[in-house]
Regions:
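Short, Gly/Ser/Thr-enriched beta-strand-loop segments that form substrate-interacting elements
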Residues: 100, 110-113, 428-470, 478-481
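Short active-site loop at a secondary-structure junction
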Residues: 67, 168-176, 198-257, 297-308, ...
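Short, low-complexity N-terminal intrinsically disordered segments enriched in polar/charged residues
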Residues: 27-56, 64, 143-158
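Short, surface-exposed loop or secondary-structure junction motifs
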Residues: 195, 248-453
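Short, conserved catalytic-motif segment at the N-terminal edge
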Residues: 152-210, 292
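Exposed beta-sheet edge and beta->alpha loop/turn motif
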Residues: 100-148
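Short solvent-exposed beta->alpha transition segments
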Residues: 40, 52-104
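Bacterial N-terminal signal peptides
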Residues: 11-21
Length: 503
């Protein structure tokens, strides 16, 4: 996902946890009255404008009511783009309780009307008239204790169907979903169009873009080579690629650093990427995009999500095996896992049953995007021609379940290697109300005290997730969407349902 005005080189997937509407509706309170204070009046005005869904109104309200100190950081147009993104996820907020209220500050607990998602909304204003807004935050929180009823598996399936039907009815989701228990599907769902231009609906076997889920394939390939004794996690880039011209990277960055996003390397996107996008088909084509970039910090010091690092892992796989990266992954991962529809398809070819992405982001230059409400645009001219070691293969929900079953059944890696991949290596980010960590090619979360393991993906017209729940009945969830946020909305809701509500 993206910010309101965003450098493609700093695309960050913004994620929220969702809760089931039908489980909450009967137990929620009516809107709490907002206090008649300067802060309360500003919040009430903001809520009214937000619920209008009019982006021009967002801009006007922000320009007139936000303090100059905030507008100096981000313009009214930039901030309105962020509010537009939030609007698509929430539609409006229903105030459930007042947590704090003074003349200059108000904090409320609220639910998003579309999803039932809980937030803490905080607003501060200046001390004198006209009481402009000096701070506004929207923080995801866990549902209050007792606000959700427990579900049996049959009820879980009904809740999922009800929720996804509601999202599809307002065009918030397009794509496919599969839920499995013990590796066997218990629910499949399809909504939306694979091609709006040709009126082709999505099918359960439609191939959709995975974005960064593809990093798991690269990580598995590297761990296979470690098992074979062809690589060590402590090997430096220069040991494997002595010709790599960036000596800072070659001498200080190890395989461990690349896998865990702790190398200090950055992204591949930017003006260079935009200028060469139609010619990027092989791993070697990507190296000039970042080979001269300095490290942002000493390797191992902290985490910085790095697409460039995973491209470099692809180059290492090619050097060690003497094989094209794509051929290796097909032979050693896709084929043994039984994945019959997954590949790094070239999108300028007419591939049957391949979904087109649709986005609310509009290019405003080679390295900038702005988010706009209104009709989504197809991404035929935005995305790359072909996926690569950091992401972008196409697959189906059924194929990704096959991958999960093969990986967890130790057909691709040993139990020791899988445990190594799915053990916390570094703090990743604050994910909604919980912390998220990174292993080797896997995101590791602890949601409501239960482990969630997998990977998400996001790009223009792409949102995807593959996750399993080892402490919660051994469920696996695969969701693929050809909308910017559709897949994330669904996976976040299912995380909450499975870890908090399932009996």
């Amino acid at each position: 996902m993206h910010r309101a005005k965003i450098r493609i080189s700093t695309i960050i997937l913004l994620c929220l946890l969702f809760v089931p509407i039908s489980s909450l509706t009967a137990q929620t309170k009516p809107d709490a009255p907002i206090p008649d204070t300067p802060a309360g009046k500003q919040l009430e005005g903001w809520l009214r404008v937000f619920a209008s869904g009019n982006q021009d109104s967002f801009v006007r309200f922000i320009a007139e009511h936000y303090h100059k100190s905030l507008l100096d950081q981000d313009t009214a147009i930039d901030r309105a783009g962020g509010q537009a993104r939030a609007y698509l996820d929430a539609r409006s907020f229903e105030i459930r309780s007042i947590e704090k209220s003074t003349a200059q500050e108000i904090a409320v607990l609220a639910q998003a009307s579309l999803t039932g998602l809980w937030f803490r909304l905080t607003m501060k204003v200046e001390a004198q008239s006209p009481y402009r807004i000096t701070e506004y935050t929207r923080q995801r929180i866990h549902p209050p204790a007792g606000s959700q009823r427990k579900l049996r598996e049959r009820e879980l399936v009904r809740e999922i169907k009800s929720f996804t039907d509601k999202l599809a009815a307002v065009d918030a989701f397009s794509g496919t979903l599969l839920v499995a228990k013990d590796g066997k599907p218990i629910y499949k769902m399809v909504h939306g169009m694979a091609s709006k231009a040709y009126n082709v609906p999505n099918r359960i076997d439609t191939k959709l873009n995975l974005a960064s889920i593809g990093k798991t394939f690269t990580a598995v390939a590297i761990l296979q080579l470690v098992e074979q004794g062809k690589l060590s996690l402590t090997d430096t880039v220069g040991k494997i690629l002595p010709e790599y011209s960036n000596k800072q990277v070659a001498t200080r960055v190890t395989i461990h650093h690349l896998l865990s996003h702790t190398s200090g390397m950055g992204d591949i996107h930017g003006p260079k990427y935009a200028a060469r996008i139609s010619s990027l088909r092989q791993v070697r084509d990507y190296l000039p995009l970042f080979v001269d970039d300095p490290l942002s910090f000493e390797p191992g010091a902290r985490m910085q999500y790095s697409n460039a690092g995973y491209i470099l892992l692809g180059a290492i796989i090619e050097k060690v095996t003497g094989e094209n990266y794509f051929d290796y992954v097909r032979r050693r991962i896709f084929k043994p896992a039984g994945m019959v529809a997954t590949d790094y398809y070239e999108t300028d070819l007419d591939i049957p049953n391949l979904a087109t992405g649709y986005t609310n982001w509009i290019e405003q230059g080679a390295d900038y995007q702005e988010f706009h409400l209104g009709p989504r645009r197809n991404t035929l001219h935005y995305g790359g021609i072909k996926g690569n070691p950091q992401g972008g293969p196409f697959s189906t929900v059924e194929d990704l379940l096959r991958f999960s079953v093969a990986l967890r059944g130790y057909r691709l890696l040993s139990a020791q290697s899988l445990d190594l991949m799915t053990t916390k290596k570094i703090f990743f980010r604050k994910y909604a109300a919980d912390d998220s960590y990174y292993g080797y090619g896997f995101e590791l979360e602890n949601i409501n005290g239960q482990r969630v393991i997998g990977h998400t993906g996001g790009d223009l017209g792409v949102s995807s997730a593959l996750e399993w729940f080892p402490d919660s009945g051994n469920y696996t969830v695969v969701v693929l969407s050809n909308y910017d946020r559709g897949g994330i909305i669904v996976i976040d809701k299912l995380q909450e349902m499975i870890t908090l509500q399932l009996k």
